[in-house]
């Protein structure tokens, strides 16, 4: 159980430090193309591998540029994380584009459209009472 807590702590620290490095440490302009945020960090039990999930707000071309920039900065980030976290061996980093927020926004948009259509048709919505038929 202590091993699990350590992995969680390391993941939280990696998320914090990587967020800081995204703002102040990486000079590659590609990384600053869109609004970039780290949504999740997964670290293997042996602390040798790390998946960092990134959400990028912007067009697909901007997302591609940001991911290319992050890929190019992987070695720098790994070295900085090893130094900042004082780890003997920093984990190997893999960046993954997280589309969860984008998918959630799409679902909310679709639900809004359905609600507007229902209102236009005059359909009965949840919470309204049906007229009594004697």
Curated annotation (Swiss-Prot):
Cellular compartment(s): Cytoplasm
Keyword entries, A-Z: Cytoplasm, Ribosome biogenesis
Highest taxon above the source species: Bacteria
BP GO terms, sorted: maturation of SSU-rRNA
Coiled coil: none
Record-linked InterPro entries: KH_dom-like_a/b, RbfA, RbfA_dom_sf, Ribosome-bd_factorA_CS
Subunit text: Monomer. Binds 30S ribosomal subunits, but not 50S ribosomal subunits or 70S ribosomes.
Protein function: One of several proteins that assist in the late maturation steps of the functional core of the 30S ribosomal subunit. Associates with free 30S ribosomal subunits (but not with 30S subunits that are part of 70S ribosomes or polysomes). Required for efficient processing of 16S rRNA. May interact with the 5'-terminal helix region of 16S rRNA.
Matches recorded under HAMAP family: RbfA
Family statement: Belongs to the RbfA family.
Protein name per UniProt: Ribosome-binding factor A
Organism: Synechococcus sp. (strain CC9311)
Record lineage: Bacteria, Bacillati, Cyanobacteriota, Cyanophyceae, Synechococcales
């Amino acid at each position: 159980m202590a091993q699990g807590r350590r992995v969680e702590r390391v993941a939280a620290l990696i998320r914090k430090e990587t967020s800081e490095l995204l703002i102040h440490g990486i000079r590659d302009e590609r990384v600053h193309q869109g609004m970039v945020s780290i949504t999740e960090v997964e670290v293997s039990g042996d602390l040798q591998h790390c998946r960092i999930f990134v959400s990028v707000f912007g067009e697909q071309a901007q997302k591609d540029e940001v991911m290319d920039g992050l890929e190019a900065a992987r070695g720098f980030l790994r070295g900085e994380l090893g130094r900042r976290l004082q780890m003997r061996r920093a984990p190997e980093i893999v960046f993954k584009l997280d589309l969860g927020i984008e998918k959630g926004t799409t679902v909310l948009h679709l639900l809004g459209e359905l609600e507007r259509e229902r209102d236009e048709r005059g359909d009965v919505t949840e919470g309204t009472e049906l007229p009594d038929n004697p």
